[in-house]
């Protein structure tokens, strides 16, 4: 049963200044009826920020009613990254999705994907828009995009993220705009909107500093393609943070130790380092907290998501500029941002994800990439997506964009999961997202393994050191026996045992030896 989405619709049309678009205002219900069964739909938004939710709720409600009448209705949904529970979650619960890409965090969508009810395509965030533009997914029928307002001359004021919104507006045959009057119009001052085009005519990106701008503050849509404008007042999905625990703080401190060592070795500039990227969640927040007390000044971030911790670093002058794809803040963080939006506009740039995650820019700027993971093996291969090799967690997201192209690629993990029943360091990962060729540093609460310039056997010795003490002896035993084989080779493995830890967990609920 879909919640009452009509409560979010409002009659105030003052945010729609253009007469052309004013004449296109319709209800969310009417907008939903325009979307046919089987449509490929591109939704705006990135990590919950700036995602339309009222029209998706209306689509889900329509789907439930059609299903009750014995009629088929499902759409194929492409986004920027994860979205709001009132987009991913409600569509999944209403059995209104046949396909989803490129990234999810909603538990209902995850369950439907892992039970094979929704086909899921796990894609690098920088790549999806280009793949759709090239026709790999077929024609895009609809773009459904949240904006903060529409100017008199028809320009679209972006919301708290753009994700792939501008690409969808360009590509889709038809467009529905959700004008969210809860979003501040001053967001206009933060955005840098540009698209790259396809080879052989793709544009070079002239971004040589984090704060460089190459586009316009507005998005645009061909008025002839816009079939509906829905005016709403909805809150952004807010980030809920749990207090930082000892393990997260230890990981953050170990990252700082690594960075300090790089400064001592003259591989990084003292105080300002190189541009940083960090993922979402408690461990990245712990890294931000550690940066706060480490004495750095003039830091820059070229990243995907701005969280509360990064906002604090900007306010305190530790971070000079942050380029991102979205603002994903708590209630308190959003209040701080809105009250001081003119200040933050001087330090924050919001870009489409084909810019924020662009490999060309990441490599040129020398970004230090910091991302979470599910597990790594003793040789440095990393699994970021599939629990026990089969169950999708969220997706690769932007970790591949940054890990392969960053100056330094760092992966962060607690040494165990499930109360110690799972070791995050295993003989061989059950799924590979980032190969040993792309991983440089792995950090746990027990230290960091610097894998740069090391052979597989040398890497294994470093990885075992940062594993949980409960698992180190077993890892060392596996490695020693693998090395003692007659044909141990370049990367020693015992193939009959390589995935035995995962098999044991599936059968007994623990990886620990009996």
Locate the predicted segments by residue.
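Conserved alpha/beta enzyme-core scaffold
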Residues: 2-514
């Amino acid at each position: 049963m879909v919640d009452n989405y009509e409560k979010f619709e409002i009659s105030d049309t003052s945010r729609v200044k253009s007469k052309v678009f004013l004449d296109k205002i319709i209800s969310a219900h009417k907008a939903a009826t325009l979307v046919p069964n089987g449509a490929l739909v591109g939704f705006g938004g990135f990590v919950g920020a700036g995602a339309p939710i009222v029209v998706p709720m209306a689509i889900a409600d329509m789907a439930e009613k059609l299903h009750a009448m014995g009629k088929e209705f499902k759409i194929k949904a492409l986004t920027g990254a994860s979205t709001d529970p009132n987009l991913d979650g409600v569509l999944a619960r209403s059995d209104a999705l046949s396909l989803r890409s490129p990234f999810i965090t909603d538990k209902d969508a995850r369950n439907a994907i892992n039970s094979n009810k929704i086909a899921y395509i796990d894609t690098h965030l920088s790549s999806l828009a280009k793949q759709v533009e090239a026709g790999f997914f077929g024609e895009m029928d609809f773009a459904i995009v949240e904006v903060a307002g529409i100017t008199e001359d028809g320009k679209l004021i972006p919301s708290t993220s753009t994700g792939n919104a501008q690409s969808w507006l360009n590509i889709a045959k038809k467009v529905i705009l959700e004008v969210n009057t809860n979003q501040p119009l001053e967001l206009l001052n933060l955005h840098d909107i540009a698209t790259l085009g396809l080879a052989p005519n793709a544009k070079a990106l002239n971004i040589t500093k984090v704060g460089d701008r190459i586009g316009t503050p507005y998005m645009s849509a061909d008025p002839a393609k816009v079939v509906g404008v829905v005016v709403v007042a909805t809150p952004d999905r807010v980030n809920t943070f749990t207090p930082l625990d000892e393990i997260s703080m230890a990981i953050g401190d170990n990252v700082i130790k690594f960075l300090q060592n790089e400064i001592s070795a003259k591989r990084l500039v003292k105080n300002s380092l190189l541009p940083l990227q960090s993922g979402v969640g408690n461990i990245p927040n712990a890294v931000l907290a550690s940066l706060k007390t480490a004495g750095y000044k003039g830091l820059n971030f070229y990243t995907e998501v701005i969280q509360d911790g990064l906002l604090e670093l900007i306010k305190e002058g530790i971070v000079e500029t942050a380029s991102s794809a979205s603002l994903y803040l708590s209630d308190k963080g959003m209040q701080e941002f809105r009250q001081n939006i003119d200040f933050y506009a001087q330090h924050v740039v919001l870009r489409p994800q084909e810019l924020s995650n662009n490999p060309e820019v990441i490599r040129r700027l020398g970004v230090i990439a910091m991302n979470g993971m599910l597990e790594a093996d003793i040789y440095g291969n990393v699994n970021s997506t599939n629990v026990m090799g089969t169950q999708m967690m969220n997706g690769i997201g932007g970790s591949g964009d940054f890990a392969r192209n960053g100056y330094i690629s760092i992966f962060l993990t607690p040494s165990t999961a499930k109360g110690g029943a799972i070791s995050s360091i295993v003989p061989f990962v059950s799924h590979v997202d980032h190969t040993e060729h792309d991983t440089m540093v792995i950090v746990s609460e027990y230290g960091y393994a610097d894998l740069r310039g090391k052979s597989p056997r040398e890497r294994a010795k470093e990885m075992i050191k940062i594993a949980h003490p409960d698992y180190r002896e077993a890892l060392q035993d596996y490695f020693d026996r693998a090395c003692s084989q007659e044909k141990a080779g370049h990367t020693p493995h015992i193939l009959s045992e390589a995935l035995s830890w995962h098999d044991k967990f599936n059968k007994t609920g623990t990886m620990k030896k009996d």
